[in-house]
Amino acid sequence: MLAAVLTAPPEPFVPPEIVGQKVVGVLGCWCGGLDQGAAALEPLRSLKPLVDVFSPMPYPALQQMLDGSAPPGLRNYFRGGYAAGLSNDLIDAVLDHGARMPSPMSAIHLHQMGGAVGRAGPDGTAFSGRAAAYTYNLISTWTDPAEDGQHIAANRDLAARLAPLAQDGSYVNFLTDTAGDSNARVRAAYGDALYVRLARLKREFDPGNLFRANHNIRPAR
């Protein structure tokens, strides 16, 4: 389950009167019986959402639902983190910033964790934050290079506000900040124990660091 603060897009399923307004959207996936899925959705549907496009669909269709919102050529800046819960301070920060996002293409995502994600051990895979209840992704997207500073600054402001509320680590896919020591940020994203293990594997399988065009883990010395 994912909740997002975003600008209502000009899509056929969106009522014209809310297009361009800041809204909260909920995305989810139920992999099981249709009757059980409908029952799981009932608490959300009882809130009478302005738009409801939940329906049975093939898995590839689910994967393609948001493709149209990310065409080639956009400018992007991402940050993220993990949270133990949805505190009032976290919700207030997200809603306050969400109402002032300078681009209609930007969004703030709150992903529910737990379940299968949390059943793996903390050092069993190359993924940190398995004990977190939520992960948040701050997604800034725009088109004009002249506006880079404005959108990056807005994203960093929210990241700084959320930092005291966050747990250790972050989701590496949303680690696009290039300020400061990038290796230190990558290490912080994975956590010390996991980073050390990955650095040793890097030394074994890629000692020359050929595969480095990424959030790089340097081979252990």
Regions found by a protein language model. Name each.
Residues 1-221:
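Soluble FAD-dependent oxygen oxidases
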